[in-house]
Amino acid sequence: VGCGGLRAIDDRHGEIKRMYVAPAARGTGVSTAILRRLEAEARALGWERLVLETGEQQPDAMRFYEREGFSRIPLYGHYVDSAISRCYGKSL
């Protein structure tokens, strides 16, 4: 139905990777449940901040992350030169 992962950036920061929910399961709370679990795992690892990348062609994803407390940040890492990426961050 859905998935998501975490990648360490350093001892205090991590990145949400590959978060996806099947179209049929969107709007059912699955996205929120996955994100809450990822945030809990990040806190358990001692991380203070999470970042993520999504595509500018994914307005539902952008609204979701903003609703969940993420703010737009400058492009980072592999996405610095991307014309189609939007990056977000959230302090835990």
Where are these predicted regions, by residue range?
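Acetyl-CoA-dependent GNAT
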Residues: 1-17, 22-23, 35-37, 41, ...
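Conserved glycine-rich acetyl-CoA-binding loop
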Residues: 13-14, 18, 22-33, 43-45, ...
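C-terminal "cap" of GNAT-fold acetyltransferases
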Residues: 48-51, 55-69, 74-92
